[in-house]
Design a protein with these regions (language model features):
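Alpha-helical lid/collar subdomain of P-loop NTPases
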Residues: 171-277
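AAA+ P-loop NTPase catalytic core and its hallmark functional loops
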Residues: 1-182, 186
Length: 277
């Protein structure tokens, strides 16, 4: 996924993880502190000033533009405390286009004035989001933030930071490895092509049985987006040392069962216990 959410308690390392990971793979990193007043995409990409007749650009837009000139270098954009404002307001355009094929990942920046010659990577006032760009959002769970909606969760891979972990020492070499976008894509493709990592018909049947149970008990279902995410994530998860069952558990718990949050009826507890058994 090109959109990842790190969510949980404050002070558990959500902001540190992308910082150190970017350093480890030698990726370009931009931290964007989200503000509570953000309401639309202009807070991220800037706007055209009618008085000065100039575009007031942001560091976010500049970095996105530069990413188009460095297609083999991974660029990470960290939206720090992303839910201090409503994500679906200022990030709506990005949420939509990331659902399309990669060649259609385009954001309209501005309507160009007549006879205006745009920069090379800003054709017709539109900027391409290249596939070497990854968005990472850090999100706290407290009274100062907004609840992240299902629309956002469904389009992202969410990693929970619910517990404080003890310090540990890294065994082995932790020096920078200079991972390029093409090398990363090759690793993805190798994992997806490995038949032993892929979901089998039997795996899908087991998953369907659980899905039917969740629908019957909680009236919760999901669309093809999650099925596509399963086919993409499971092989990569297994290639990293996990199992198919763990990968499905990861997705089900965050994409489907999380929708039960806030329901306290006794039948919910009983149905969940039966599901676990």
């Amino acid at each position: 996924s090109h959109f990842i959410i790190l969510e949980g308690l404050s002070g558990t390392g959500k902001s540190s993880l992308p910082r150190y990971f970017a350093k480890f793979i030698n990726a370009n990193l931009l931290f964007v502190p989200v503000q509570a007043t953000w309401r639309d995409k202009t807070n991220l990409i800037g706007y055209f000033n009618d008085f000065s007749k100039a575009y007031s650009e942001t560091e976010f837009l500049t970095s996105l533009y530069h990413a188009n000139y460095n297609p083999d270098m991974i660029h990470m954009f960290v939206l720090d405390e992303m839910n201090i404002s409503r994500v679906e307001y200022y990030f709506a355009d990005f949420l939509s286009v990331l659902e399309y094929p990669e060649e259609e990942w385009k954001i309209k920046i501005m309507q160009l004035p007549y006879n205006f010659i745009p920069p090379a990577k800003l054709d017709d006032g539109v900027i391409q989001i290249p596939n070497n760009v990854y968005f990472v959002g850090t999100a706290n769970k407290d009274d100062s933030t907004f609840t992240i909606t299902d629309k956002v969760y469904d389009r992202a891979i969410t990693i929970d930071f619910d517990n404080r972990n003890d310090a540990f020492n890294v065994n082995g070499d932790a020096s920078t490895i200079n991972l390029s976008r093409s090398a990363l894509a090759k690793l993805y493709q190798e994992a997806k092509n490995n038949k032993s990592y892929q979901m089998t018909d039997n795996d899908y049947q087991k998953f369907q049985t659980i899905s039917d149970y969740i629908y019957d008990q909680f009236d919760i279902t999901f669309g093809n987006r999650i099925l596509n995410q399963i086919s993409e994530l499971v092989p990569v998860f297994v290639s990293c040392g996990g199992t198919k069952e763990e990968a499905l558990d990861f997705l089900l718990s965050r994409k489907v069962i999380s929708k039960i949050e806030g329901r306290f009826e006794e039948y919910v507890k009983n149905a969940l216990s039966e599901l676990l058994n």
